[in-house]
Amino acid sequence: MGIKQYSQEELKEMALVEIAHELFEEHKKPVPFQELLNEIASLLGVKKEELGDRIAQFYTDLNIDGRFLALSDQTWGLRSWYPYDQLDEETQPTVKAKKKKAKKAVEEDLDLDEFEEIDEDDLDLDEVEEELDLEADDFDEEDLDEDDDDLEIEEDIIDEDDEDYDDEEEEIK
């Protein structure tokens, strides 16, 4: 039964995934998702925006329903059209070739004369270590003690749940 044989009322009662299946059966070729939505909207006599609430569920149904197959570039088709061996070849994305010229251009733009050479012998590591030691001496342990005073925990607080638990233990005995 073709999609055109359904009445407008029957189409509106059908699930979008069923309408899509009928469209694929009729066209016998893969269709991009947006085109599929446009065709369904025109068949139902509504604007694509009016389908907005149902689009997410429709896309989910297409993914879950075993009759449909997602091909490259948001294109969908029926699984029955593709033999099992051909599925991997059809659905694998194409890898774009990398441009080697762009990498060479970046290397040419990089001017090594702009960078200053540093001689490791000129570096005075002792001076850096002394600066770090001075910063460590500035650190005051009294500051830590003050922070610890702020964190003292009151042990006198008893949670009501603990009291209820104690009462239950006494009742059991």
From Swiss-Prot:
Q: Please provide, alphabetically and separated by semicolons, the GO molecular function terms listed in this UniProt record.
A: DNA-directed RNA polymerase activity
Q: Tell me the ranges covered by the HTH HARE-type domain, including all copies.
A: 14-81
Q: Which UniProt keywords apply?
A: DNA-directed RNA polymerase, Nucleotidyltransferase, Transcription, Transferase
Q: Which Gene3D superfamilies match?
A: RNA polymerase, subunit delta, N-terminal domain
On whether Endoplasmic reticulum is a keyword of this UniProt record, the answer is no
Instruction: For the region Disordered, give the residue spans.
Output: 110-173
A biological process (GO) of this protein is: DNA-templated transcription
InterPro entries with a match to the protein in the record: Asxl_HARE-HTH (IPR007759), RNAP_delta_N_dom_sf (IPR038087), RpoE (IPR029757)
Summarize the record's disruption phenotype note: No visible phenotype; grows as well as wild-type at 25-49 degrees Celsius, no apparent impairment in sporulation or phage SP01 growth.
User: Can you tell me which family this protein belongs to?
Assistant: Belongs to the RpoE family.
Fill in the subunit field for this protein: RNAP is composed of a core of 2 alpha, a beta and a beta' subunit. The core is associated with a delta subunit, and at least one of epsilon or omega. When a sigma factor is associated with the core the holoenzyme is formed, which can initiate transcription.
This protein is called what? DNA-directed RNA polymerase subunit delta
Q: Which organism is it from?
A: Bacillus subtilis (strain 168)
Q: What is the lineage of its organism?
A: Bacteria, Bacillati, Bacillota, Bacilli, Bacillales
